[in-house]
Amino acid sequence: MFQLESLKNKIIVIKYGGSIFHTLKNNKSFIEDLKTLKKCGANIIIIHGGGNEISKWLKKLQINNKFINGLRVTDSTTIEIVEMVLSGKINKQLVSTLSKEGINSIGLSGVDNNLLLCKKKYTFVNEIKKDLGYVGEIYKVNTDLLINIMNLGIIPIISPIGTDINGNRYNINADYAASSISSALNANRLIILTDVDGIYKNINDSSSLIENINLTSIKKYIKNGIVNNGMIPKLQCCSHSIEHGTKSVQLINGNRSHCIYNALFNKCGTKIVKGDDLKCQKAI
């Protein structure tokens, strides 16, 4: 039986999706859940997205949005806008909201102190290599920086902009960033907040929500087309995180009241584990 006291010194990584960012100011239960976790001694890291806000600003500036395999093509002009929105706007709004509520936090981007070292990422369409521009793939996380900050009782809030060894900045998919950070720290949980309740066998049937799933089942569901579109890269990130050190991953609806608290007790969303999906493994 899970108990809140077991959170002491455990690492909880939270990915706050851009699709739910507009609800943050009114989401008092999210703030309350963070306070509960901190009171229990948990070490928290938040990585945020911001795709909708980026698209809005690109449209304002009459810059075309182009995606390949769900990844935003990011040229030299677009990366400036992406960094401005993620690091300059959304990141600081998150920090401001938490600080106002008495939660100690600090805003960072992956550029700061080489937090997220990247190399250029490519994708393939029908086995043809496609250039995405300034889109990055993380190969190293500065875990010492994050651990030092958490040891001070401060929550790092991270914008998914990375850098290479030459100082070039890269746009990183926030799910991939959260997965990489979580696995590098061997986090006890990665909780991905999105705008759906979890993984469904049939997206049109609310009773088909999958509560627990293992890596083998994820691969089978993707192959058989049970999950598709934007859920595929999310599940691939979940699988990557589990395979590389994270104890468990949960995909939950960030618009639900006390979603973080309920996730800890496995009362919402879909939980991804390594072993038997019928016997949900104890992660904390």
Curated annotation (Swiss-Prot):
Q: Name one GO cellular component term.
A: cytoplasm
Q: Where is this site: Transition state stabilizer?
A: 15, 234
Q: Which Gene3D superfamilies match?
A: Acetylglutamate kinase-like (3.40.1160.10)
**InterPro entries per UniProt:** AceGlu_kinase-like_sf, AcgluKinase_fam, ArgB, Asp/Glu/Uridylate_kinase, Glu/AcGlu_kinase
* UniProt subcellular location: Cytoplasm
| Family note | Belongs to the acetylglutamate kinase family. ArgB subfamily.
This molecule's function is given as: Catalyzes the ATP-dependent phosphorylation of N-acetyl-L-glutamate.
By what name is this protein known?
Acetylglutamate kinase
Q: Which organism is it from?
A: Clostridium novyi (strain NT)
Give the gene that encodes this protein.
argB
